[in-house]
Amino acid sequence: FEQLRPEIYLIADPLFWIVPEKRVQLFRTLAEKTAWPMSLFIPARALKNKEWQPMLAGNRNIRLCIYNTTPIEGVQGFCNWVFAKGWGVPRPHNVLIPSIAIGLRLPFKKIYLAGADHSWLPEITVTDDNVVLMHQKHFYDQNKSQAATVTQENLHSARLYTILYHMYVAFKSYFVLEAYARRLGK
């Protein structure tokens, strides 16, 4: 993080503001280590949780940019219009979807994705007790990650059909964003 010094940083996972340990780890680290101007994109619904906000308040380098995660579906032309207004995004199942959607609204000609590995299906297992485990490898913890239950926003374990449905939604969202990008000439 300190070597890359990103100008733009986006979070999407609600567990970052719901789970106290994750909240403290992320926001305290951002506040302590961000010594350059950075725009931090945070979903509007994160504003309901006030506990992370004081952690960032003392760092003038961090500019909060609030984005709308209202899931938009329908006729592509209507979706494009809503995306351009910033009133919503394709269903934001993962951080890539709002990142791409917001990136398309910024003055970039091209968006390059790095570390966006989606080999999810081979990473799913179901135990004899019908508990779904997923080995969610991220580029920053590939050697340390282990198979674990998938935690939903309500902090309960997700069922297999829910996980597979969310994968479907994510992949569909990528195609919606591709059509939007083509419409923008990007």
What are these regions (language model features)?
Residues 1-186:
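Metal-ion/cofactor- or nucleotide/acyl-coenzyme-handling active-site neighborhoods
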